[in-house]
Structure formats: structure tokens, C-alpha cells
Amino acid sequence: MIRIRTSSSTVILAVVIAALSTFCLAEPQTWQIDPNHTAAQFSVKHLGISTVRGQFEKASGTVSFDPSDPTKTSIEATIDASTVNTRVQMRDNDLRSPHFFEVEKYPTITFKSTRAESAGTGKLKVTGDLTIHGVTKQVVLDVDASSQPINDPMGKGLRMGASATTSVDCRDFGITYMQGIVADEIQITLDVELTRPAK
């Protein structure tokens, strides 16, 4: 029979390490949006009979998250408006033009959160300022942050996923071209992958 002797000091050390690990996990964490694994997607009704879908190909930003108090979550994100892609070149050029996003004058779409509220386990309602076409309006994102962090398989720190949805009225942002052909309400879905260095 093999007996394993454990001293009281070893037990105390293990407890301290566990407590410190928990404390570290509870600290506010800043995550970077990974543009290579993030999609800012939108959909809009065309003639009231079909749905046109597209996305912006380039997004960046940061998310600050406190596991012990998710209501302290803050988000800052920037989208390159010129990267709009609906898979139809003529339509994409029109979306970049003064008819819609006017990307030469307003090259970015930005979001900056102002408040976060719990909406259930792993769920948040994040209120913030959305700026499109040079106009800023308050919107609420329904956020699913139930994903748990994992170790990057390439050894580059930690990764975590999140998603968010909202809808906006393009008229609120001064975009009124082709009313009656393209619906005013736009559905937005964000699928985000976040990264941060491992401690």
C-alpha cells in the first residue's frame, strides 16, 4: 500500500492558489475583437417580398468584461463602411455612394456602449451610441455572452465567442434613398470572436 502524506502547509498553499485563481478570473478583462473571425451582418427587405443579406468585412474594437459583474461590460467597436459586401458589385458600389453610407465622407460605423443590464444567464442588454452616416443614435444590443473562454490551439492566449442582435431604422441616420423599394428597418447580427493574452 502506498501512503501519500500531505502536510497542513501544502493544504494551505493549495487553498491560497485556488483563491488567487478565482480572484484573477473575477478581475475585469479586456478582450480584442478578432477581425478575421468576426462578422457584422445585416438584412433588409426588398420590395417587401425577399430579403437581401450582406456584411461588412472589417471590424475591430475592444470589450471590457468583469465576470463577477457583467453589468460593468463595456464595448467599443469600429466597422470599415467601405468593406460592405452583398455579393453584387453594382449594389455594393451604390451602398458606398452618397445614396447610402457615403463612405468617402463617413468611412466608419462605430458603437460605444453606455450601459449594460443582465438579461438572464449569459445574456445582456447593452445600450450604446451607434454612429452611421455621421449620425449618432442610441440602440440596444441583445447580447449572448454565454460562451466560455478557451485556450487558443495555436498557443496565442485565450479566445471567447459572443453574438449580438439589434434593428435600426435607416431614416434615423439620414438614409432615405429608394424608400418603398428597400425597407426602412434593417436587422443587424454580430458574430464576434474575442482574444486576450493568457496570464
Protein language model annotation of sequence segments:
Residues 10-22:
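Bacterial N-terminal signal peptides
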Residues 24-199:
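Low-complexity, acidic/polar, glycine-enriched regions of mature
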